[in-house]
Amino acid sequence: MKKILVITTGGTIAMKKDRETGGLMPAVSGKDLAAAVPGLAHYADVDVLEFSNKPSGWMTAADMFELSKLIDRLADTDQADGFVITHGTDTLEETAFFLEAVLKTEKPVCVTGAMRGASDLSADGPANILAAVRTAASGESIGKGVTVCLGDRIYAAWDVTKVHTTNPDTFRDLHYGSIGTVYGSRVEYGRIPVKHKKIHTDRIEEDIWIITCWSGMDGGIVYGAEGKAAGLVIDGIGCGNVPPKCRKAVLYLREKGMPIVLTTRVPSGSVEEEYSYEGSALSMKDSGIILGCLLYTSDAADDR
C-alpha cells in the first residue's frame, strides 16, 4: 500500500462556523481533517503533517517556498510515495503553480481544498481529500507534475484557475480542460500535461506588483512602483496590449532595469504578437518586456 503524506495548510476545508460571528474560522486540525474521511485507510497508508492553519489569502510567497522545500526534503526519504496538500481555494492555484515550477521531486503531489466549511451542510472537503489521496497514490500520477483535484476532476497545476466565488464546481482549465478523473474504482488520465521548464533557486522575490490595464488608463499606478516593487506583471487588454500612457510608464521602468511580464486580463487565450502598433504585445516585446504567453496573471507573479 502506498504511503501518502497529507500536508495541511488551512483554508475553508479546515474551517467551521464561529458561533459569535456566524462566519467561517480556522478550527479543524490536520489530523481531524483526515479522520473525517471515511474509508481513507482502504486506499493508502496516510500520515498527516500540519504546515499551517490559516486562510489561503494569508499565504505568502515565502510560505509557498518553505512548503516546496519541505516536500522535496521529505520526498528524498522513504516517508512518502506521494503528497496531498490541503489548501484554501482563494489562492490554491497560485501555490499549485508555484510548486509545479520549483519542485524537484517526480513523486505525485496533489493539491485539494473545499468550497464549504467542515461544519456546513454537504461539506465537500472529505470527498476531495479522498479523491486527492487516491490520485497521489495512483501509479498513473507519477511524472504528471503537480495536480489539482476537486470534485473528482484532476487538473494540471500550470493551467487551472478558480472561476466562481462560491460554487463548489469552481476550478477549470480554460485552455484544455481536465487531464483526468477519479472514478469509483480507479484514477484515469485522458491526457499528459505539457512539461514546462523548472526553476531551481535558493531565493525568491516577494515584492512583485500586479497591475491591470483598462481603457484610458494613465501611467500613475505604474510610476508608483518605482522604488517599491522589484518587478511588475502588467495585466494587458486583449491579446496583451497596453494603453498609450500606461505604455510610457512601463517602458520607463523597464529602462530603469525592472523586470516586467506582460499577461492579459482575458480569462482564456494567450498573449500574442498580433499587432504592431505602439503598446501592442509585439512592440512591448521589442522594448524588452517579457511576454507571459498562456500564464494567468497570478501565475506570472508566482514565477518570481
Q: Could you tell me what each predicted segment is?
A:
Residues M1-R73, K248, S268:
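ATP/NTP phosphate-donor binding region
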Residues I7-T8, S29, A36-V37, A156-C239:
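Accessory alpha-helical/coil subdomains and C-terminal extensions
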Residues E20-V28, T91, F97-V109, G125-A131, ...:
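A glycine- and small-aliphatic-rich helix-loop capping segment at beta-alpha/alpha-beta transitions
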Residues A80-L92, K228-C239:
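Short acidic, glycine-rich surface-loop motifs adjacent to enzyme active sites
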Residues I85-E106, V242-V250:
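Short Gly/Thr/Asp-enriched flexible loops that form oxyanion-binding sites at enzyme active sites
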Residues V111-V182:
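Internal gly/pro-rich beta-alpha loop/helix module
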Residues S215-L294:
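Catalytic cores of soluble, metal-dependent hydrolases
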Residues Y296-D303:
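Conserved small/polar residues in nucleotide/adenosyl-binding loops
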